[in-house]
């Protein structure tokens, strides 16, 4: 089974929002998220709920829960077997924040 490659989206100024988000998580939450990213690399577009969910306009969310902490990293699939991580957030409500999705869609359009 071929694995996918996971890369961080990089802005024109060189920032990598998903990487910054990942580094800001607690050690336990970061470890679980990295574990989930490895699962995403392995299963790619075959990964389904509860780990991954399609949102809209080609954007998916990787869902990680550690205790009462729930984090999400938004991503999209690119040419070949490439997964681009755009941004992340700690979930505080039942719905994914619209501004986070809008940012991910904008980032996707700048790449595709």
Feature roles, as predicted:
Residues 89:
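Residue-level signal for short, function-critical loop segments
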């Amino acid at each position: 089974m071929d694995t996918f490659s996971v890369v961080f989206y990089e802005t024109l100024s060189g920032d990598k929002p998903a990487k910054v988000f990942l580094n800001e998580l607690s050690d336990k939450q970061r470890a679980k998220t990295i574990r989930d990213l490895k699962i995403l690399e392995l299963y790619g577009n075959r990964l389904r709920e509860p780990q991954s969910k399609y949102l809209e306009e080609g954007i998916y969310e990787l869902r990680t829960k550690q205790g009462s902490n729930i984090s999400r990293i938004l991503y999209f699939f690119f040419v070949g077997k490439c997964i681009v991580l755009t941004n992340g957030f700690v979930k505080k409500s039942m719905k994914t924040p619209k501004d986070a999705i809008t940012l991910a869609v904008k980032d996707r359009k700048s790449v595709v």
